[in-house]
């Protein structure tokens, strides 16, 4: 019997950690695809009135929205740190990913694929904002293998899902060579079987996706 149902779509940055944790904990998840909030059915809007993803519905009918909450519910104690400070730091980096990196990255990427209006000035600003936030991660990871503590935590899996699109479409070899702390961390965490099983092998950009209107 499934642990529950996860409403999401392929390559959704907010869902990778949820899927990886479920895989690691042998929690079978039924996946239902929601391609866009514009296509959300009335049934789905009853679960999540904003029509956003992901949304989790447990086998017992328990409904949970917001990716951080779902990831925490899905997780086990081994991924949540060993002290109160580590737990707080894990939440900190998850929040940093979802509130700081993802909106900036979306402002860079979405106009290039027609998902948002194309305004070059705004896109360049979003690019600068994204790279500044990734620099914070790169600096933090100096001398560290993981974001929090000495072992893998939920923060690593969650932030990996947030930044994988940047590595796939924008962060070319030159950038990766100049930011080895973050790049090495990305390669290390993405190589984990629980990640590869749900996301496939990493795809690394050969060149930065150009800022030009979508064709």
Swiss-Prot record:
Domain GST C-terminal stretches: 83-211
Pathway: Mycotoxin biosynthesis; sterigmatocystin biosynthesis
One Gene Ontology molecular-function label: transferase activity
Keywords, in A-Z order: Transferase
Named cofactor requirement(s): glutathione
Endpoints of the signal sequence: none
GO biological process terms on file: sterigmatocystin biosynthetic process
Binding site for glutathione: 52, 66
Inducing or repressing factors: The genes forming the sterigmatocystin biosynthesis cluster are co-regulated and induced on oatmeal porridge or the fungal isolates were grown either on oatmeal porridge or in YEC medium (0.2% yeast extract, 5.0% corn steep liquor). Expression is positively regulated by the cluster-specific transcription factor aflR that binds the palindromic sequence 5'-TCG(N5)CGA-3'found in the promoter.
GO cellular component, one term: nucleus
Positions of substrate binding: 52
Domain annotation GST N-terminal: ranges: 2-82
Pfam families named among the record's database cross-references: GST_C, GST_N
The protein's Enzyme Commission number: 2.5.1.-
Primary enzyme class: transferase
Family label: Belongs to the GST superfamily.
Function description: Glutathione S-transferase; part of the gene cluster that mediates the biosynthesis of sterigmatocystin (ST), a polyketide-derived furanocoumarin which is part of the most toxic and carcinogenic compounds among the known mycotoxins. The first step in the biosynthesis of sterigmatocystin is the production of hexanoate by the fatty acid synthase (FAS) units stcJ and stcK. The polyketide backbone is assembled by the non-reducing polyketide synthase stcA by condensation of the starter hexanoyl-CoA and 7 malonyl-CoA extender units followed by cyclization and release of norsolorinic acid.
Stored PANTHER family: ELONGATION FACTOR 1-GAMMA (PTHR43986:SF1)
Protein name listed in UniProt: Glutathione S-transferase stcT
């Amino acid at each position: 019997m499934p642990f529950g149902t996860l409403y999401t779509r392929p390559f959704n940055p907010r869902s990778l950690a949820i899927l990886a944790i479920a895989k690691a904990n042998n929690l079978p998840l039924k996946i239902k695809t929601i391609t866009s909030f514009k296509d959300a059915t009335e049934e789905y809007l009853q679960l999540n009135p904003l029509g956003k993803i992901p949304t989790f519905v447990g086998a017992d009918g328990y409904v949970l929205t917001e990716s951080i909450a779902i990831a925490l519910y899905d997780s086990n104690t081994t991924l949540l740190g060993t002290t109160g400070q580590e737990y707080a730091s894990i939440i900190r980096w998850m929040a940093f990913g979802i509130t700081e990196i993802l909106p900036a990255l979306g402002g860079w990427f979405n106009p290039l694929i027609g998902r948002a209006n194309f305004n070059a000035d705004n896109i360049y600003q979003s690019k600068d904002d994204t790279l500044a936030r990734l620099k914070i991660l790169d600096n933090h990871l100096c001398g560290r293998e993981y974001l929090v503590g000495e072992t893998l935590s939920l923060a690593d899996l969650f932030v990996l899902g947030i930044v994988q699109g940047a590595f796939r479409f924008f962060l070319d070899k030159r950038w990766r060579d100049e930011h080895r702390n973050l790049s090495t961390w990305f390669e290390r965490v993405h190589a984990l079987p629980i990640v590869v099983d749900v996301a496939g092998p990493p795809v690394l950009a050969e060149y930065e996706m150009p800022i030009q209107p979508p064709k």
